[in-house]
From Swiss-Prot:
Its main location: cytoplasm. GO terms for cellular component: cytoplasm. Coiled coil: none annotated. The gene is tig. This is Trigger factor. It catalyses: [protein]-peptidylproline (omega=180) = [protein]-peptidylproline (omega=0).
Length: 436
């Protein structure tokens, strides 16, 4: 076994290696003898053909097979000896092989990055101290009531916040406006309708279901095609339905529907408080973790192999497809740069956490695994499904095990970190998270 040249370039490696000719020829001869015992050749009984005839027919095929096996065996043995973690499929190349001459070949491969952890003694994080107030519960209760409202038809004239269903088409100088026709188009008036032409909503306000009318609109500067911008368009509208959003009454039946057994407002407020506490616990934990990770990424320059990035990109795309569902491909595709940056960051975080766990000899706390599962179940409408998955699926337990190990790794670093406590209102903290 011999490595002649090592062309090392960080994570992408290329080595030149040599196999002695006598090893190759001995291996080919051995393979030919084994093959001769089983091969069937016309004119001879099975396994009785002379070795020179077997060699003439199968030598080239066996030679290629033997060369690959010997190259692979030699390369793997060399990597194990040098304790190099190869993460890609090795690519073997050679110019030619001549009998009685040593084989010189090249191997290209990628290795796993080695993380030399820096900055663990200079971490500073802000820890939010959030006190849940009655006003926070009031706000959450109001939001809960709004979320459980329903749309009801009305014969009243349409107004802002009503939902309308319309048919329409547009014309310019008595000619149909291409792309302006719509059937059963529904939207809520005045609620962030970027896809609605400015002026259309105002023209609908005041009309009732069953009305047919025209709305004159000068096409906006953002309209396409360009030559139609600023021109007067007439939209013919059939208002088919007007709906108002009705809020539920805060009574016993509604409260029980929300999972509060006693049906009391006090019981509901207690449940909301617990919901906020669980939500807040996770939010604070993730907020601190994000600070730690961002700092470590800023002081640790971690190279990531191309093959790991490509694998992570495929995982991200698969998750995006499942999350978004069946939509146009153009809407699903993100720019290559964005996905690649996201994939690289995720791998770097994983490598950092692995190194932290290794350095601190962290073992997963099984009691915390159960606690995390119960938190996940509490916050999810599929509570029983999560519990059943945890009890029956090893993949679910592995997922939670990784979450717990991450938490323990961050906590180990926080033991030495400069933690600055800062009081902040619940609403302000959640708003800060949404804008970060």
């Amino acid at each position: 076994m011999q490595i002649l040249v090592d062309h090392s370039q960080k994570l992408r490696r290329s080595v030149t290696m040599k196999i002695a000719s006598h090893i190759i020829e001995e291996t080919i001869s051995k393979k030919l003898l084994e093959l001769a015992k089983t091969v069937v050749i016309d004119g001879f009984r099975k396994g009785k053909a002379p070795i020179h005839i077997v060699a003439k027919r199968y030598h080239n095929y066996l030679c290629q097979d033997v060369l690959y096996q010997l190259m692979h065996q030699q390369f793997i043995a060399a990597m194990l000896k040098e304790k190099i973690n190869v993460i890609s499929t090795p690519n073997y190349t050679y110019s030619t092989y001549q009998k009685d001459k040593d084989l010189i070949y090249q191997v290209e491969f990628e290795i796993s990055p080695q993380v030399e952890l820096k900055g663990i003694d200079t971490i500073t994080v802000e820890k939010p101290l959030v006190q849940i107030k009655e006003t926070d519960i009031d706000a959450m209760l109001t939001q809960l009531i709004k979320q459980n409202g329903s749309w009801e038809k009305t014969n009243n004239a349409a107004k802002i916040t009503d939902r309308v269903t319309i048919d329409l088409y547009g014309t310019i100088e008595n000619k149909r406006l291409k792309g302006s026709q719509a059937k059963n188009l529904n939207f809520t008036i005045g609620i962030n309708n970027k896809h609605i032409i400015p002026g259309l909503e105002n023209g609908i306000i005041g009309h009732k279901a069953g009305d047919n009318f025209n709305i004159n609109i000068y096409l906006p500067d953002e309209y396409f095609p360009l030559e139609l911008r600023g021109k007067l368009a007439i939209f013919t509208v059939a208002l088919k339905k007007v709906e108002q959003y009705r809020l539920p009454h805060l009574d016993e039946s509604f409260i029980k529907l929300l999972g509060v057994v006693d049906g009391t407002v006090e019981g509901l407020r207690n449940k909301i408080r617990k919901d906020i506490e669980v939500l807040l616990k996770n939010a604070v934990r993730n907020y601190i973790k994000e600070q730690v990770i961002n700092y470590l990424l800023s002081v640790n320059n971690i190279d990531v192999p191309d093959i790991m990035i490509e694998q992570e990109i495929q995982i991200i795309k698969q998750k995006n497809t499942k999350h978004i569902g069946r939509i146009r491909k153009s809407a699903l595709e993100q720019s290559r740069e964005l996905i690649e940056a996201q994939a690289k960051r995720r791998i770097q975080i994983t490598l950092l956490l692995i190194e932290i766990i290794k350095q601190h000899d962290i073992k997963v706390n099984t009691a915390r695994m159960r606690a995390i599962m119960e938190e996940m179940a509490y916050l999810s409408p599929q509570k029983q499904e999560i519990i059943n998955s945890y009890n029956s699926q090893s993949s679910m337990r592995r997922q939670i095990s990784n979450i717990v190990l991450e938490e323990q790794a961050i906590e180990a670093l926080l033991m030495k970190a400069n933690v600055i406590e800062k009081k902040i209102d619940f609403a302000d903290f959640m708003s800060k998270l949404s804008h970060s």
